[in-house]
């Protein structure tokens, strides 16, 4: 059998088993709505598969399941608090629920992307509980407990199905990606030392940026897979920092070569020009480079020496990750040498727009439902909250909303066939019911791995509109209300995204660039504790977001890279201890923070001019302290860079 077909069939079987097992156990334990367990199993297993375009890693499935449990608990708690405080005022209760959904979406847009699902789920879980139980508020505590139980059952069934069908470990992919990343780092160094075209260097750098980010995502999946991988997980965090450092130092070498300050010649240049295509060749090449560097260290540029040192640390950590052995004393010193600085979100305005979309959409929908008494209103409201909560953090919310809409349109005829022909023919047989649902899930599971538009939405929507409750009833009007309500909810969500436009792209890009300016100035310090802080992961995270926002804007990309390189250069400077210089550092950091957080262009320009003035004064203080020429030159280079790009950073 074709190697690409077998994993798809395996995942389709895994998905079918998870959905059928959760449904059967839900009926076996006499739960009131077993479809919630089946729906949870489908979403937790199929969501990562749709993103990956194939059989997802076990850690990704478990991570998704854990996030769903946490989000459900938070949402149930929020629903109970809202009910207890406003049970005598139904309209106020629904408005508070809409406000809760908007706040949760706002928070989900500020946290890390991999954790945003928790708060998005918490928002619409409270909406589901309150809207579904609005007619009988006294039953809401029992309703919340049942929902939590059924969701936990669905997640347990997904994990069991994953274990039955050979869980896919991410470890081998991590090992291959780490070797490939080091090879790419060396090829970037070759381009920066040689005379490669600027576009070629940018393309290589961009590829390394995405590879390093991908390994960061694998790191989280590896820990969720098993606690056995914790030593490798710890090493990977520092290994990523070494990767950022090697990229930065290679870029600094390229800038120095362009300015004529970095000349690599002789045997070292000949060695660097030799092509390297395999990890084995790379190891031999690096050994020879270190041997030459040890004998000619005084004549080599400092960034090249730093790059070789970082590559040695990278190889040591990579070997430990490969074997997952106990962390040695030398590795402990590397792990504890620096303190990574966490990046704060630069998408505050974007997050506010996302929360506003969800809050306004659900509030208007609730008022319309209450005024008209529309029979499909509750389902429409739930779908409106679900879509607006889940798609906002995605790179293209409009396309994701269209995917939901297409899925609900597919679910109408598919669900009608299942509801009116297939399910009644099972004659209340749990075995036949499981077989029918399993076959449907198997077919859709194959399409999900192809990332077919509407496939994931079709699976979730079809399971949701089928009356998989205990006891099962076949009410055609209720089925049509649910199906039509889902479609109208998706249409309204799509309309909300189109009407409430997000114009924060330019503002977020400017904020990211000014955060990079602040990071560059953070490299100036005389305090040992501050010098140990590693800002590179946070700075490259800002750069990655900037590339996603402006994929074709090479001017912003190169400015951001230049600021990161300047930060690394300033961080390596040996600035003498002085109260005057330390006070200058504090003032410049404070002013740079004001530039990044300024509300308007006028205020930002004023703070930026103040920052340039402070940097000129700082250069004068450096001259008075008779510091080394390289320190003065590095500060002058940063000042010139800011003056040259003042328009891009302020307007």
Curated annotation (Swiss-Prot):
Classification via InterPro entries: PHBA_efflux_AaeB/fusaric-R, PHBA_efflux_pump_AaeB
The keyword Transmembrane helix belongs to this UniProt entry's keyword annotation: yes
Gene Ontology biological-process annotations: carboxylic acid transport
Membrane topology: Multi-pass membrane protein
Residue spans crossing the bilayer: 11-31, 41-61, 65-85, 91-111, 117-137, 150-170, 367-387, 404-424, 428-448, 454-474, 480-500
GO cellular component: plasma membrane
Subcellular location as annotated: Cell inner membrane
Highest taxon of the lineage: Bacteria
Keywords for the protein's UniProt record, in alphabetical order: Cell inner membrane, Cell membrane, Membrane, Transmembrane, Transmembrane helix, Transport
Record GO terms (molecular function): transmembrane transporter activity
One Pfam family, short name: FUSC
Sequence similarity: Belongs to the aromatic acid exporter ArAE (TC 2.A.85) family.
Stated role: Forms an efflux pump with AaeA. Could function as a metabolic relief valve, allowing to eliminate certain compounds when they accumulate to high levels in the cell.
Protein name: p-hydroxybenzoic acid efflux pump subunit AaeB
Source organism of the structure: Musicola paradisiaca (strain Ech703)
């Amino acid at each position: 059998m074709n190697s690409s077909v077998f994993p798809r069939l395996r995942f389709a079987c895994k998905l079918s088993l998870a959905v059928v097992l959760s449904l059967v156990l839900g009926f076996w334990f006499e739960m009131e709505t077993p479809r919630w367990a089946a729906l949870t199993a489908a979403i937790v297993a199929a969501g990562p598969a749709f993103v990956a375009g194939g059989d997802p890693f076990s850690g990704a499935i478990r991570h998704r399941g854990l996030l769903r449990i946490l989000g459900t608990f938070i949402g149930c708690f929020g629903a109970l608090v809202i009910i207890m405080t406003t049970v005598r005022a139904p309209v106020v209760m629904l408005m508070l629920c809409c406000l809760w959904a908007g706040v949760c979406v706002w928070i989900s847009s500020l946290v890390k992307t991999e954790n945003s699902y928790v708060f998005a789920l918490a928002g619409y879980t409270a909406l589901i509980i309150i809207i579904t139980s609005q007619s009988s508020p006294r039953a809401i505590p029992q309703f919340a407990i049942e929902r939590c139980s059924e969701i936990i059952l669905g997640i347990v069934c997904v994990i069991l199905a994953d274990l039955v069908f050979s869980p896919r470990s991410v470890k081998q992919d991590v090992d291959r990606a780490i070797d490939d990343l080091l090879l790419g780092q060396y090829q970037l160094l070759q381009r920066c030392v040689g005379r490669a075209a600027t576009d070629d260097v940018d393309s290589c750098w961009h590829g390394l940026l995405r590879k390093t980010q991908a390994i960061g995502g694998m790191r989280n999946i590896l820990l969720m897979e098993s606690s056995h991988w914790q030593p490798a997980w710890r090493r990977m965090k520092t290994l990523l920092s070494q990767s950022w450092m090697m990229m930065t130092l290679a870029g600094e070498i390229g800038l120095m070569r362009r300015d004529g300050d970095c000349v690599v010649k002789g045997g070292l240049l000949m060695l660097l020009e030799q092509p390297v295509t395999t990890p084995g060749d790379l190891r031999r090449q690096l050994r020879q480079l270190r041997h030459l560097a040890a004998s000619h260290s005084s004549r080599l540029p400092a960034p090249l020496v730093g790059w070789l040192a970082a590559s040695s640390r990278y190889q040591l950590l990579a070997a430990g990750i490969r074997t997952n052995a106990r962390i040695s004393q030398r590795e402990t010193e590397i792990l504890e040498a620096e303190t990574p600085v966490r990046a704060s979100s630069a998408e505050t305005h974007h997050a506010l727009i996302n929360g506003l979309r969800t809050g306004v959409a659900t509030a208007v929908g609730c008022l319309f439902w209450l005024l008209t008494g529309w029979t499909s209103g509750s389902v429409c409201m739930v779908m409106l909250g679900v879509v607006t909560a889940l798609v906002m953090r995605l790179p293209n919310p409009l396309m994701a909303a269209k995917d939901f809409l297409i899925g609900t349109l597919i679910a109408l005829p598919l669900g009608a066939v299942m509801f009116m022909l297939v399910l009644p023919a099972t004659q209340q047989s749990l075995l036949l019911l499981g077989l029918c649902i399993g076959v449907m899930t198997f077919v859709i599971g194959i399409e999900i791995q192809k990332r077919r538009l509407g496939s994931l939405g079709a699976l979730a929507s079809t399971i949701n509109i089928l009356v998989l409750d205990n006891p099962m009833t076949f009410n055609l009007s209720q089925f049509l209300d649910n199906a039509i309500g889902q479609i109208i909810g998706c249409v309204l969500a799509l309309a909300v995204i189109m009407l409430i436009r997000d114009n924060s792209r330019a503002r977020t890009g400017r904020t990211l660039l000014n955060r990079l300016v602040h990071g560059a100035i953070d490299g100036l310090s005389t305090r040992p504790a501050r010098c140990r802080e590693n800002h590179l992961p946070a700075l490259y995270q800002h750069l990655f977001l900037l590339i996603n926002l402006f994929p074709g804007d090479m001017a912003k990309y190169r400015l951001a890279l230049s600021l990161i390189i300047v930060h690394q250069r300033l961080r390596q400077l040996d600035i003498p201890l002085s109260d005057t210089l330390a006070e200058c550092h504090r003032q410049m950091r404070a002013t740079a923070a004001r530039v990044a957080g300024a509300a308007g262009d006028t205020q930002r320009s004023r703070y930026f001019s103040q920052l340039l003035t402070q940097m000129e004064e700082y250069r004068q203080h450096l001259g008075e302290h008779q510091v080394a020429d390289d320190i003065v030159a590095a500060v002058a280079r940063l000042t010139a860079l800011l003056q040259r790009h003042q328009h891009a950073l302020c307007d």
